[in-house]
Amino acid sequence: MTTAAFTPWILGLTGGIGSGKSAAAERFVELGVHLVDADQAARWVVEPGRPALASIVERFGPGVLQGDGQLDRAALRQLIFADPAQRKWLEQLLHPLIGQEIFSYLAKAQSPYAVYVSPLLIESGQHHKTQRVLVIDAPQDLQIARTLARDNTSAEHVQAILQAQLAREDRLRHADDVVVNDGGLAALHEQIDRLHHFYLTLKGGQP
């Protein structure tokens, strides 16, 4: 089978803000698993010179650009956060392009399985394109504490993001596997390592 025709076994990885998705994703990479991050793909499609960035500037004006021509994501978020119509326009522009980038990179996987990490895996419907869904879960107070420690933001803003995201119960309902990330990094790694071995058995690979 040629590489171009190869469709990997895909694990969808998701979780709410501050749940520990990034730490879980990093562990899969350390274990040699091919990983594609939806947030990275979202950055690729709006790089300077790409058609999507030109469309965004045409709609919102040059104020959404930084001095170096890169997209000012914070400025754009402010413009669309409280405007559902503008947010929908942006999603309709970017989601198909991001999807193309994601599955192009997933198709290059050389590991027994690939991981696709996205905070909107379920909301976007892309979990239907994966073979299994892993949810990284954490208590909401811990999600808030982690986000405040990581980002220069307010508790109110984090609460607003949590309310805008898929409800925790709905996310868990779509999960095939759940990692409860309410401890330290070692505990998270232990759970990811155990699941990695399990996923290799599903694929017939060797740990």
UniProtKB/Swiss-Prot annotation:
Its main location: cytoplasm. This is Dephospho-CoA kinase. Its EC number is 2.7.1.24. Gene3D superfamilies: P-loop containing nucleotide triphosphate hydrolases. Catalyzes the phosphorylation of the 3'-hydroxyl group of dephosphocoenzyme A to form coenzyme A. Residues 10-207 form the DPCK domain. GO terms for biological process: coenzyme A biosynthetic process. It is an enzyme of class 2 (transferase). Belongs to the CoaE family.
